[in-house]
Swiss-Prot record:
Main location: secreted
Keyword match Cell division: no
InterPro entries: Beta-defensin (IPR050544), Beta_defensin_dom (IPR025933)
Function: Has antibacterial activity.
Name by which UniProt lists this protein: Beta-defensin 128
Xref: Pfam families: Defensin_beta_2
Protein localization: Secreted
Disulphide connectivity of cysteines: C24-C52, C32-C46, C36-C53
Region forming the signal peptide: 1-18
Gene: DEFB128
Keyword set includes Signal: yes
Amino acid sequence: MKLFLVLIILLFEVLTDGARLKKCFNNVTGYCRKKCKVGERYEIGCLSGKLCCINYEEEKEHVSFKKPHQHSGEKLSVQQDYIILPTVTIFTV
């Protein structure tokens, strides 16, 4: 009887975890689905082979990050704390 109760509890735990929608990636605010709903658009593919559907209204709330503008003619006069050395691997020999 105790084993039966444990199995029933575990069965409900598995079902509740599987019912949640999976998020696409950390930096994307979408969900993985087979088909996108109305008002959503397909951005990229998920690892499971489904579509990453992003809502238009949620996307408008998030402002895209822009890189600061650097002048191409100016050179930086700051010394670097490190030196980039060439690496040699088995494939380059």
